[in-house]
A protein has these predicted regions:
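Short, solvent-exposed helix-to-loop capping segments enriched in aromatics
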Residues: 108-122
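N-terminal leader/targeting segments and the immediate start of mature chains
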Residues: 2-3, 13, 17, 21-56, ...
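Gly/Pro-enriched, hydrophobic low-complexity segments
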Residues: 100, 123-206
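Short beta-strands and strand-coil junctions in structured, solvent-facing domains, enriched
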Residues: 50-51, 78-80, 98, 146-150
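Beta-strand residues in well-ordered beta-sheet regions across diverse protein folds
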Residues: 43, 73, 83, 92, ...
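Extracytoplasmic
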Residues: 37-39, 57-59, 65-67, 77, ...
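An acidic-aromatic
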Residues: 61-110, 175-176
Length: 206
């Protein structure tokens, strides 16, 4: 094995700069991502397009740790925090000082977050390879249970790093989440996925 080939394989093992051709299919790449990437963080831009064509753009940050722990922080245009602590999923709106929670199993079922933070995606989704587009390897994920609002998801990888999510929902909306400089197996503080409602907040728990 040449020095350059050895160096490339070392990078693949470290999940820094991997080569997409190391995977037979895009679904293999997704399954490898689930198996080997135990945590991650990134900033993101989310664009939601309504059936009539009107778009809403928001920005924020995202962190996760398997299984079922994650934090979405929306910063613009409206602040909102969504935290999954492994048991519950909390949604907090600081402008209204309102917090609500649901059991993680109910909140994550068939959602985009489940595709990223779950350990067994084949149990929840039917996976199918899609043509490469825009330099990304794409997988179509269709929920096996016809529940919730998500009809289908597409996840795109660039060099084994999570790059984009495309979401089609039952309201006819299309959402695109673009992850910027995704960091695999990031070391995250222990309190990243802890949420305590602020004093005086209106709290509703299910």
């Amino acid at each position: 094995m040449t020095v350059s080939r050895l160096a490339r394989n070392t990078l693949i093992a470290a999940f820094a700069l991997s080569c997409a051709s190391a995977f037979a299919t895009a679904t293999d790449e997704l399954r490898d991502f689930v198996r080997t990437v135990k945590s991650g963080k990134s900033t993101f831009t989310q664009t939601v397009t309504a059936p009539a064509g009107k778009q809403k753009v928001s920005n924020g940050s995202f962190e996760f740790s398997r299984p079922n722990r994650f934090r979405f922080v929306y910063e613009k245009p409206y602040a909102q925090t969504v935290v999954g602590d492994g048991t519950k999923v909390w949604i907090y709106d600081p402008d209204l000082n309102q917090a609500s929670s649901r059991k993680v199993g109910d909140a994550l079922a068939n959602t985009p977050a489940a595709l990223i933070v779950s350990n067994d995606i084949d149990k929840v989704f039917t996976l199918a390879d899609q043509p490469s587009k825009d330099g990304l390897d794409w997988v179509l994920a269709t929920p096996k249970q016809a529940e919730g609002t998500v009809r289908s998801l597409k996840v795109g990888f660039r060099n084994h790093a999570l790059a984009q999510l495309e979401i089609d929902d039952s309201f006819g909306q299309k959402s695109l989440i673009v992850f910027n400089a995704f960091e695999s197996n990031a070391k995250l503080p222990a309190d990243t996925f802890v949420f305590v409602p602020p004093k005086g907040a209106d709290v509703a728990e299910q």
